[in-house]
UniProtKB/Swiss-Prot annotation:
The modification Phosphoserine is found at residue 414. This is Microtubule-associated protein TORTIFOLIA1. Keywords: Coiled coil, Cytoplasm, Cytoskeleton, Microtubule, Phosphoprotein, Repeat. Residues 1-26, 329-353, 426-504, 615-670 are annotated as: Disordered. Residues 17-26, 439-448, 489-504 have a biased composition (Polar residues). Plant-specific microtubule-associated protein (MAP) that regulates the orientation of cortical microtubules and the direction of organ growth. Determines microtubule organization by modulating microtubule severing. It comes from Arabidopsis thaliana. Residues 508-561 form a coiled coil.
Amino acid sequence: MSTPTTSGSAAKPTRPARSSSLATRSCSNSGSLTSFQAMVELKQKILTSISKLADRDTYQIAVEDLEKTIQSLTPETLPMFLNCLYDSCSDPKPAVKKECLHLLSYVCSLHCDSTAAHLTKIIAQIVKRLKDSDSGVRDACRDTIGALSGIYLKGKEEGTNTGSASLAVGLFVKPLFEAMGEQNKVVQSGASMCMARMVESAASPPVTSFQKLCPRICKLLSNSSFLAKASLLPVVSSLSQVGAIAPQSLESLLESIHDCLGSTDWVTRKAAAETLTALASHSSGLIKEKTDSTITVLETCRFDKIKPVRESVTEALQLWKKISGKYVDGASDDSKLSASEQLGSEKNGEKRSNLADLMKKEASDGSTLSPDSASKGKGCFPEKAVGLLKKKAPVLSDKDFNPEFFQRLERRQSVEVVVPRRCKNNDEEESGLDDLNAMGSSNRLKNTQADDKQVKGRFDGNGSQARTSGDDKAGVVNGKETPGHHAPVSNTDNQSEGSFTSNRGNWSAIQRQLLQLERQQTNLMNMLQEFIGGSHDSMVTLEGRVRGLERIVEDMARDLSISSGRRANLTAGFGKYNSFANYPTGKYNGRAPGERGSQTDGAMRGRMWNSDMADDWFIPPHAASRNGQAGPRRSPRSEQYENEHMGNGRRGWDNKASGTIRFGEGPSARSVWQASKDEATLEAIRVAGEDGAVPRPTRVAVAPEAEAMGDDDNEGQERDPIWVSWSNAMHSLRVGDIDAAYAEVLCAGDQHLVIKLMDKTGPSLDQMSNEIANEALNFISQFLLDHSLYDICLSWSQQLLELVLQDGADTFGVPMELKTEILYNLQDACSTMDPPEDWEGPAPEQLVVQLASVWEIDLQQFDK
């Protein structure tokens, strides 16, 4: 019984053990749950900070938070942080990608031992980012590779470290060479830059491992499908800087670089030259025995058309020559060349001095010319030879002179003899010299009319030089023959003088014939010009006379028409401006019927007034008002004149002709034809022709028919005041004073004269004073309601609007009453009449609205 008891008592303590294991398990589960939550919170914090990198405002804060997080990482949280950076490297924002790459290098620098196991994946992620289109991201990849190289490529290859160093280098170069194998120039270039930075940034470069890169680099440089040779060549420069150029690969490497020097891409050529410079600077011991081929290639490339390439090639060439020992020899060669050039120039100078001495000697002997005479005279040798010598002057500096050639050239055409001076010993010698001077003077006078090819004699002040003309006696002075002067050239002188004489005669005859032809041609041209000028003048004169005759006949026909109209209907209205507007033909008029209303310019500012319109100024007084009302501004003088002449018509010759011509009848065609033969009419025609179609508004002061019929009483008659006003206005127009012309017509107070002048000058408000402009506007406001004057008023209203818009509402100081009247009448005319068909200006309604707007007048008050 004791055994069960014992066993039962022994089994009881096992129950607390089960409960303790359960408690431990629950504690571990709660701890793992807490750590998992902490990991989740940390990841969320990291992702939040990374997302803040995309915003410039929160960028710096996010960087600081991430750096603090990196400093607090543990081996357990490191993979999670790296995965967050891997995922963020695919962010579309370049700023996020660049900062994540920098953070990778920062993590590796702080946790190099923990990240060594993740180095393969880190480098793969960096190489993957080389495909990015943003160059800033690729530069960040290069910097990150350089930072990692400085961290992990520290150990030297000594003893057992060789395998680990080679393994570390392999971790870097394997993904980079794989990227270089892609047919993408951007990726190839980025991988090459990363490899160059890796070699440069290695703290303790593993030379043996780097030397293994040379064969693969040579293979890529020789491969035509590799596109980024300009980026791969700096890798060779970096290997040369760290002393990692393998001697067995040097020859193939140089051949590849030589091929790159002949590339069509100037960036590749420049990179190849810089690589050769780096090899000469850092690997001179290796290349000392292999410089000839490289120097030859550089010599062929030193004149590259791209300046940066030329500079790089020149620098490399100097270094390679210096290594080969040819640089000093080159300098000595240059010095020898300069010395030889100097020696050659000295020799040429001596030869030139010898030639000058020879020419002086020959000049003293008298057989040839002196240098002065050779430079001045035209007959010493041909002009072609002189031109040839001038053209070849620069070439002669490097060649020997040929005195014999110049002697031959000068003796061929030399015809001058230099006679030495002699002292005047006695009277006989003086007389001999006088004879010689006289002979030379006669010869010179004979040759004064020769052309430039003739030989001219020269004499000094004492008569020491004379020309020989083939006579042996010309060389004899004072009964003695001058030895050695004329004898060698006497035959040549005879032949030359004979040929020159014949040539001179031929040239003189040709010259005389040419001068005669030129004079005849000049005379013919003068005669032709005179004939053309006379014909033109005659045509102009005839045209002027015909125009004058047409105007006179037109005036006669107009007067006949007026008289016929009075007989038919004394109170009938006139046409556009006068009854002649309906004349059946425009043959004798200077323009076609109805031309007055044609307005090609909407503003009509500054329109030239027609000369023909200056003559038909007369408007019957019974048509004074177009609206059936009397004119408001008729002066007493005009009313008195109208009362005096209303019964018998406006013209003074109607009163004179009342005894012979019945009322309402004009002169018959026969009487007009007979009157045209009168002296006065012929004189008028003659004067009209001399005027050359110049406007003569005073021509119709007295009817030409009355002048032609010999009404001498008209000469003593007092001149018509209306005619005087119109005559003065036309005179003002001719001198360009439009304001005075309108002042004269407005003072006369005759509406018809105002209408005629407005039509003649066109809108001219800009050339009037304020007072005259207001008077003209007063007439325009009343003419607006006349259908026949509507086009004139529209053009003047348009100019008024332009001036008001330009100078302001107070232009001309128009009173408010006149403004209101103009707007009211213009609005009324717009509602009742249509603008002319040829009107090209703005619509009349627009004129009303714009004028009312500028003048600040409410148009609605007119409706009320």
